[in-house]
Amino acid sequence: FAGELEGVGFDPCLTLMAALKPLCTPPFVTRTDVDDALAWIADDSSKPDRGTEACWVAQASPAWSVKYLNSDSEAIAAMMLPMLCDRLGITNAKVRYATAHRWRYAKVSQPLEKPFICNTSRTLYAGGDWCLGARLEAAWTSGDSIARDILGLA
């Protein structure tokens, strides 16, 4: 089924993880702005049972990620960190640690448009969010469809 996979496309996502000195009042817990270079920002330390460090995760937009995908992690962090500080209204002096990660195939941009593929003998299945769309529900629906097919419920 390799031929079926040729049309599936993915966008990369460059991600910054930063530990900051605790902020008195963070300006937000999460922020989404698809038109910004930092399309998604979250206060990871807002989750229950976390330490006192202010830990933030920022994900770049697909366009920004494509532009800088081949940069090394240090360069990516050096570019993204000032943007995060700007969005949080802080200076770099608040930063204790920062690192970047490249997800080359982070988000499906052109899904398969069916819940799964399998070989003709139905002994090998492939599924996931890449089959139906870039959301958790797509991954769940894909897995559920595979299970139903195996059980003969489809």
Across the structure, where does each feature detected by a protein language model lie?
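Flavin-binding catalytic cores
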Residues: 50-55, 60-104
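Alpha-helical elements of Rossmann-like donor-binding domains used by nucleotide-donor carbohydrate transfer enzymes
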Residues: 36, 40, 79, 83, ...
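A residue-level signal for beta-strand positions that form part of recognition/binding surfaces
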Residues: 15, 38, 55, 123-124
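A conserved FAD-binding loop/helix module that cradles the flavin
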Residues: 118, 123, 128-154
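Central helical "cap/lid" subdomain
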Residues: 1-28, 90-93
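FAD-binding beta-loop-beta segment adjacent to the flavin cofactor pocket
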Residues: 45-53, 97-126, 130-132
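Anionic-ligand binding region
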Residues: 25-58, 66-68
